[in-house]
Amino acid sequence: MPPRDDLSLTDARRIALAAQGLDRPRPRRRANADDLRRVIDRLGLLQIDYVNVLVPAQYQVPFSRLGAYDRASLDTLVYRAPEREFTEMWAREASIVPIAHWPLLRYRMDQQDRRYRAFTQFLDKYPDYSKSVLEEIRKRGALAASELPEVDGSRGRSKGFWGWSQARCVVEALFMRGQVSVTDRRGSNNARICDLTERVIPRALLERTVERGEAIRGLLRLATRAHGIGTVSDFADYFRLRIREAQRHVAELVEAGDLREVRVEGWREQAYLHKDAEAAAASGRSRLSGSSGSSGTSERSGSSGRSRPEPLAALLSPFDPLVWNRARIARLFDFDYVLEIWVPAAKRRWGYYVLPFLFEERLAARVDLKADRDAGVLRVISSYLEPHAQPKRDAVAHALAAELQTMAAWLGLSGVQIGRRGDFARTLGAAARD
């Protein structure tokens, strides 16, 4: 079949979902380290966010693709593997990335002085103290900021940025500059444990010099593969690249054959298709649409022991790469989404921690969730159905109810409690009781 220059919005959605690994059944067995490795490699990064009203974001993104898995296995893979394959870096924001990406992101460490001046000013304000922190780590090995004395020699809490101690601000700045790297997370607050970068990142990667343009092209290759299809602004946003710079290098990727210019129904901006994306999407098309066929017997299982046939469905973290660019998901899915954590309660439209629900190839609903660990239940504070999903209201409700049960079991909660708020609450509650 010859390449097409005009794509429907449905085609674009399928391509995007396939690129994100959301077009296929979850493993029937419990996901393992190899599955987690493939997810991170496919996405290029996992954004770290420890808002724990439900589960930290870096754990939920694999869950959306793999179903229930042992969260400790992700920590082991990232921080405690015999040969380090992944590390934390400022990629999009603080992220888990394949360690091989270090040379591509290295040039950006010098730019952090401008982006995060509130932190790096501590290195200029306390140069001798900053040197002493590095020397302390050199002598004692990997440390948490809480194990370091403050500037005045005390171990008390002195006010820094966001109320952090000055020691933590200095360690954060050293991390942003690439002078220290994260070896582990520890304690109830998941504190970073940092060592000298030269003892964490392999020498071959540290010594590899990548010119800025080559690094940007490398990051854009990762972004375009992870998106499958998109605009320059979509691709630039993936690793927080400058749009003007990205524009030039996207043109070079088109010339090199990595991307192809296409037109997408309803898009005003020029769209670009990754060279491998259309074929990958075609292989998952019947699964996305929920049609029967050779893949129709596939099932998705969670730790609850319940399995359900296709169509595919998944709750998505607010920090999932599929939805973190709000303009992109509005264009792709006609889904108006904003995370309202920082919005005063009285002004929130949907809720505090609202997750989009993917059903087949559309974002069909949204739910405000809270893991109530004291009560042992997953609370659905509010639930809303998207207008386009009304004809499939019952099907969406049953798929979402099953996904909520799977998530609750994965989080070690005994059940799901569905609140009355929202236009989908009654239907969802009935489906959960079936």
Residue map of PLM features:
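Long, low-complexity intrinsically disordered regions
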Residues: 1-291, 300-328, 332-354, 359-434
